[in-house]
């Protein structure tokens, strides 16, 4: 969902039931036209919460990933996605950090470029908040 205070927010937590449900969420940008660009970088601010859900192992970091595609239409399972590596992870609950500069591969520098944040929630309450997204 989008919230002016938080930006994009993905979570498996249902506050009315005080329960977390395992799920897979995708937050996908509108189509970007990167035709003619020789390079492009993604930067954003993000936070994880609560503190117990901050990714600090390879297994927990695998729950929070970034992807790029040029053939996404309506179904994430039918698109060809390439994982973007190099994201900086925060170390405290709800502490916003910069993702760092994440390079978009040259083969994706064309029309219909979509960037996606994929969050795989287990049965532990956790939220990923993303804001101030820039592609330059």
Where in this protein do the model-derived segments appear?
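Surface-exposed coil/turn segments at beta-strand junctions on protein surfaces, enriched
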Residues: 22, 35-37, 95-97, 108-110, ...
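Extracellular carbohydrate recognition
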Residues: 20-26, 120-136
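Extracellular ligand-binding interfaces
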Residues: 45-86
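Extracellular beta-strand-rich recognition modules
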Residues: 29, 34-52, 64, 68, ...
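Extracellular/periplasmic catalytic domains that process cell-envelope and extracellular macromolecules
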Residues: 2, 35, 59-60, 107-111
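Extracellular carbohydrate recognition and processing domains
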Residues: 74-108
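Extracellular glycan-recognition surfaces and repeat-rich motifs
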Residues: 1-17
């Amino acid at each position: 969902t989008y919230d002016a205070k938080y930006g994009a927010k993905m979570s498996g937590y249902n506050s009315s039931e005080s329960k977390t449900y395992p799920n897979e969420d995708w937050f996908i940008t509108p189509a970007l036209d990167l035709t003619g660009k020789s390079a492009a970088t993604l930067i954003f601010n993000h936070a994880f919460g609560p503190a117990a859900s901050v990714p600090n192992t390879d297994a927990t970091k695998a729950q929070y990933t970034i992807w790029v595609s040029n053939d996404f239409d309506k179904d994430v399972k039918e698109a060809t996605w390439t994982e973007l590596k190099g994201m900086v992870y925060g170390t405290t609950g709800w502490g916003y950090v910069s993702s760092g500069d994440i390079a978009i591969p040259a083969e994706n520098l064309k029309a219909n470029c979509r960037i996606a944040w994929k969050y795989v929630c287990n049965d532990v309450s956790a939220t990923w908040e993303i804001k101030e997204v820039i592609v330059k």
